[in-house]
Amino acid sequence: MTIREICNVLRTELYDNGYEYGFVVNGQKYKPNMENGFDKEYYHLSTTIYCVQDPVTTMKEKIGTCVDAVLVMRWLLNKHNIPSKIWLLYNKQKNKVHTILTFEAENKIVYLELTPQSSKAWYGKEIVYSNEQEFLSEYETNGYDISDVTDSIVIGQQPEFLLAKLN
């Protein structure tokens, strides 16, 4: 598959399907309310009761965090035997974390931001890198710690790989 074809598969599920940012616990949906700025209550819940969702649950409920979105992407990519990695970005100065996914196609590394309701200017657009080192260097140059967490994510458990950075 070409980069364009792969991105279209991912966008069809996550970009065009009305996903919301948040999570589900015991059938209850939790979403941040940003009307008054940062939602402290949601943040507290996301660091205490949130557990990584199964990609099938995320696709059924149409709600997920950045972790859940990249797991859906990986699940779809695995169906097409497309190699991918999940990365944790940590901005020390702002004490913020974000998980993203890259995949390999046409001898390139591709990053496609599909976290629901992302305010990033590149939401839904692919960024193509010549190789993994170019991708890593861009984030390191911009002050991020970046870690491969592909094998650290456990469905049904809290995202300890992420929470450890915030504590």
Segments (PLM) and residue ranges:
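A structural boundary/capping signal
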Residues: 1-167
